[in-house]
Amino acid sequence: MQIAVTNLKGGTGKTTTAIYLACALSETGSTLLIDTDPQGSASLWAENAPELPFSTVAVPSPAVARQARDLAERYEHLVIDTPPGHPGITSAALTSVDLVVVPLTTGSVDLVRFGTTCELVEAAQAINPTLHGFALLTKTRANTASRRDVRAAIADAGMLPLLDAEIPLREAIAGAEGTLPTSLDAYSQVLDELNARTKGLTP
C-alpha cells in the first residue's frame, strides 16, 4: 500500500496520522515513511522514538516524486507525510502513490481549506489516474453537532468521499508525539476500510 497523508492546512493531525498508519502497516510488511515537510515533524518524531517499526527518510522537495518511486521498490508499504502550505511538494508526492488520505477536524476553518486540498487532489488525479482519495475526520467527539455538520457538509459538497472510520480525541493519541504509539485500533480500522473501499476499483 502506498499512501500520502495531506492537507494544505496545518493542525489537522496529519503527521500523527502518517506515523500511526506507518506503524499499523508495518504489522503486515516492511514500511517506509517519507517526510516531505521542511519542518521535519515526522523525522523529529522518529529521531525521538528510534524504536518505531518502520524506516524514515526526509525528502522535503518536489524530488519526492522520483525518489518515492525508487524507494517503493524496496518496501511493501509507503507512507508520505506532506507539508501544509507547500502545494508543489504535495502535488509531486501525489503522483507517486495510489491513495491519499486527507485528515481534517470538525472546525469550520478546516472545512474551508479542505476544498482547496480537494482541488489539489483532483489535479493530481489527472496526472496519476490510479490515485484514489478519502477524507478522514480526526480529533472527534462522539455525538456532537459539529461532527454531524461536517459529515453532512462534505457529503453535500460532493468532494472526496469521507471514511466511516474516525480518529477520536484521545490523550493517548494527542500526547503520542515523539513516542512509540501503543494503541493502533482506530488507525487499523482506517486501513481496513481503505482496503475494503479500494478493492476492485479501477482508475
Indicate residue ranges for each PLM-predicted region.
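Conserved lysine of the Walker
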Residues: 14
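C-terminal boundary of histidine-terminating zinc-finger modules
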Residues: 175-194
